[in-house]
């Protein structure tokens, strides 16, 4: 088994606490509302939403995937960190056992946020991860993030 690690960093004008509430704490409600073509719904299968919780994300008609299951490892509301693993679903190919994600939102000096993400792909056997697979995932995540950011700018009184 191999582990391939990818890091990404981008910025937002939205303050970290507000962004964390929308992007992490209420994502299961917000994303299907603003991007139903990407995510149809999210449901908790086990747990209470905290560490150990298993969620099923059903993708919308605009996605070429059907569903994935996430296992939440940690949610730190004070430090704005979140980690989970993608453990099942058609986004995992026959060559990938799981993908671990860590997200940290850091308050930036200008009042916005620096978003730092780490993805760790755990492969089966000696399989290598294709760069275009990772790039496509980053582009989709970036697009979804921009939708959330746009929603927050259009609705400034929400998630305070």
UniProtKB/Swiss-Prot annotation:
One of its GO terms (cellular component) is nucleus. CDD domains: Bet_v1-like (cd07816). GO terms for molecular function: abscisic acid binding; protein phosphatase inhibitor activity; signaling receptor activity. InterPro entries: Bet_v_I/MLP, Bet_v_I_allergen, Plant_def-hormone_signal, START-like_dom_sf. Pfam families: Bet_v_1. GO terms for biological process: abscisic acid-activated signaling pathway; defense response; fruit ripening. The keyword Nucleus does not apply. Keywords: Allergen, Fruit ripening, Pathogenesis-related protein, Plant defense. The keyword 4Fe-4S does not apply. May be involved in ripening of fruits. Monomer. Belongs to the BetVI family. This is Major strawberry allergen Fra a 1-A. It comes from Fragaria ananassa.
């Amino acid at each position: 088994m191999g582990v391939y690690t990818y890091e990404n960093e981008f910025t937002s004008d939205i303050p970290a606490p507000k962004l964390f509430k929308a992007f992490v704490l209420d994502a299961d409600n917000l994303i299907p509302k603003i991007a139903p073509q990407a995510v149809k719904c999210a449901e908790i299968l086990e747990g209470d939403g905290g560490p150990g919780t298993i969620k099923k994300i059903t993708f919308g008609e605009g996605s070429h995937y059907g569903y994935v299951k996430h296992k939440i490892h940690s949610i730190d509301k004070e430090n704005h960190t979140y980690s989970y693993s993608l453990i099942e679903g058609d986004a995992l190919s026959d060559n990938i056992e799981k993908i671990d994600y860590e997200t940290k939102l850091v308050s930036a000096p200008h009042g916005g946020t620096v978003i730092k993400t780490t993805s760790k792909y755990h492969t089966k056997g000696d399989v290598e991860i294709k760069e275009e697979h990772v790039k496509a995932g980053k582009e989709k995540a970036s697009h979804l993030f921009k939708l959330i950011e746009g929603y927050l700018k259009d609705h400034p009184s929400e998630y305070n």
